[in-house]
A protein has these predicted regions:
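Conserved short hydrophobic interaction patches
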Residues: 81-82, 189, 207-210
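Basic, alpha-helical nucleic-acid-binding regions used in initiation and control of genome expression
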Residues: 201-225
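Amphipathic alpha-helical interaction segments
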Residues: 83-84, 108-109, 212, 219
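Signature for HUH/AEP ssDNA processing cores
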Residues: 1-95, 102-106, 168, 172-174, ...
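DNA replication initiation modules
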Residues: 55-72, 76, 101-202, 216
Length: 225
């Protein structure tokens, strides 16, 4: 995995983005060009001449973004540990990140804000013709802070990042009934994502326990759950 590419060496991503657009508005976060249903409108170099510009995702790609600095840091730690093959762009003003994934199987059906992910993080999920800001009023959100190497391929959205409908809030969960909640959450993953016991066990041990819970459980206690 590559990290920290020089901004002068990054010229967009032809796999992830199908076109680039001029941005504008009070905060520079909105497209000022029509693009819904249209193909290639501008190249990266053409759009980069403007104080604000952005991009539109290619078909079969999703943007999973975290509007919380702590969750963004946690995601990056997980991504590095799990060696996920994705691209991550960061808003340097607040530490929030956008992560980009293949979803050719269309496992994610709804694009909306504040979706609970299987691993316990909370995210906004974008797709389709959504405009994604890359520069806002002169402030760049590139180059990537995390990306694949030239000889690697981007991966499909991992199970950990698929949205689920649940009232369980695993983020920073501490002692006090959490074992019961973690047991009940297994049923959510089984019924909604059709994950088997081994896949759920791996998710708990590799991601949820060390990164999501406030204080990780001992292995013996986790095995009981």
């Amino acid at each position: 995995m590559e990290q920290g590419v020089n901004s002068n060496e990054w010229h967009g991503n032809a796999k992830i983005f199908r076109t680039y657009l001029k941005g504008g508005g009070k905060d520079g976060k909105r497209s000022v060009e029509k693009h819904k249903g249209l193909g290639n409108i501008r190249t990266f170099g053409d759009a980069a001449q403007f104080p604000s510009f952005g991009a539109v995702l290619s078909d079969g790609w999703v943007d999973i973004s975290f509007d919380d600095a702590e969750m963004s840091k946690t995601f990056l730690a997980i991504a590095k540990d799990q060696q996920w093959h994705c691209m991550v762009l960061e808003n340097k003003n607040n530490g929030h990140i956008h992560t980009y994934w293949k979803d050719t199987e269309h496992k994610i059906q709804k694009f909306r804000r504040d979706q609970r992910l299987a691993c316990g993080l909370l995210a906004d999920i974008h797709g389709g013709d959504t405009y994604i800001p890359l520069r806002c009023l002169g402030s760049d959100r590139f180059p990537p802070v995390f990306d694949i190497s030239p000889d690697e391929e981007y991966q499909e959205v991992p199970d950990e990042l698929l949205p689920v409908q649940t009232n369980y809030n695993l983020w920073q969960m501490d002692a006090g009934g959490r074992n019961n909640d973690l047991y009940g959450y297994i049923l959510v993953l089984q019924s909604q994502l059709q994950l088997d016991d081994d896949r759920i066990r791996t998710m708990y041990k590799a991601v949820i326990n060390p990164y999501i819970l406030k204080d990780p459980l001992e292995d013996a206690e986790l095995d009981i759950i």
